Amino acid sequence: MVKDLRTQAVDMKLHRLPKLQAAQWNLTHAQPFFPSLEQLFKTETLASMADYGIKLPEEVESVVDATHIKTTKGQTLEVHRKTTMILSPFKTMKGEYSAPGLPKPAETAKSYSEQMQSPHTAAYVGALASSALSTSECPHFPRVYGVYAAMATKHEVNISDDYEELCDRKWFVDNIGKTFELRLRGEGGEGFTHTRGQRMAVQVGEDIDLDAEDVTVEAVPEPTVEDVVEEYELPSDSEYSEESESDDEDVYDILSCDCSERSEDEEDDESAGDDEFAWATFTEVPVVTTVMEKCEGTFYELMKTTDDAQKHTAWVAQIVFALAYAQRNFGFIHNDLHGNNVMYVPTAEEFLFYRHHGVTYRVPTYGILMKIIDFDRATFSVKLTGMKEPRFFMSSQFKPDEEAGGQYNIEPFHDSKSPRIALNPSFDLARFASSMFWDMFPEGPTQKTDHPLFEMFKHWTTLPDGSSVVFRKKGDNHDRYHGFDLYKAITRYLKESAVPRKEISKFNQYVTTVSPTTKVLVIGE
């Protein structure tokens, strides 16, 4: 196992839950069972397995309305539901799965069954990670009140980031109104255009001749879960040079940016990157919904509304301690940690206490308790009490033909034709720093500032040769890698720069001998 990714035994249990009426959530046939549970629990002797799910400290008793539940402890709570399609939204839009309940060609049936039944399907992995982290002692993950697989009578997926590329696919235009409905922000009003490239909205029925080739990728067979033990050899400096050495790309290639200057269009694209403007709506599709506590806002929003460096540092310290705990107990890597995947709730606790190798840390909250969310791309292990070996779970998003393909190359999605790329415990903090740096320090790496996070973020994104995974060597305030190439570069090249447990020492200003006033979160003794 990668040395900084460890597991500790956890006391999770399975129990039978009553049927949930979830029509107000546009769900039918809701059940707490999903296939990942069979990897953890002995289920052979259980009747009506669909009625069994993970036992949580406080659970959904009934649905009050779209945003509220009544719990088994008698509380009426406002909640957030993260709902994820089990089948690939894009393959569903393309019509690859055929009509539900009807016979399918052998390859289609194989792909459909694999996605529905694999313990590594992204929707299941996200739900299991949420449940496991919720039942742990760490307060920095949302409380979960229930997980349900169900049929959604209506489900909407944000496709804004992919809209421009999708519009270049003939099947996308052809299938509007057939396999999905398309909704655009401002549709029906004047002046709506696509913010990236100013693309006009596609009109249903419009004759468009798109010179695009549809490529059918063979389904990846269901592999066995094996231990992730092999490290990827650190490449030479030439392997992460500024220029690509080959035009013959594959999913594992990494391309750095070699354009001469930062264009106005690029800046506009980045500023608009978080805008939501396009959604695909599906009917009667299988989903997993995770019912969790409602958070108040994101870390990104906090940075935009608060300029206090002491607060920023204390809140980032919470994130570092949370990740160190998750790596120590679940071998957990989030794999998509950015400013909007860290949220917060208000807290009355003035300080939080952590203990690492006998040292106690007293971190001020300033009224904010950070919560890390969204685990559909996670990799982690769960070891139940009494288990000899942990069970490893890896999101299906890491299949070579899926959205995170090329970041790792390990079981259960190992491609024997390409070098092995192991899990990287530095990934989360490096990705987090790269996502927030320009917003917090817009003048770039040469900015004059005494903000404690400035040098810390630069360290987390520095390669062994002293260059940055974020900035080009030219020092021109231009991103070195764009899009998913950044994810692959962090995984491949940053090995020791941002391991959470090793970064705890950077927060020695919080070391204390004061007796804890709240429960201490133990990271490692």
Tell me the role of every PLM-derived stretch.
Residues 65, 75-79, 138-143, 286-290, ...:
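Core residues of folded domains in eukaryotic genome-function proteins
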Residues 232-234, 242, 248, 253-255, ...:
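Catalytic activation segment of kinase domains across protein kinase-like and atypical kinase folds
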Residues 17-95:
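ATP-binding glycine-rich phosphate-binding loop
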Residues 88-135:
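The N-lobe alphaC helix and its flanking beta3-alphaC-beta4 segment of protein kinase-like domains
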Residues 90-101, 139-311, 382-389:
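Conserved structural core of kinase catalytic domains
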Residues 1-36, 42-44, 404-525:
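Helical subdomain adjoining the active site within ATP-dependent kinase catalytic cores
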Residues 74, 84-88, 149-152, 295-297, ...:
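Conserved beta-strand elements of beta-rich interaction domains across eukaryotes
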Residues 129-133, 306-334, 339, 348-349:
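Conserved kinase catalytic-core helix
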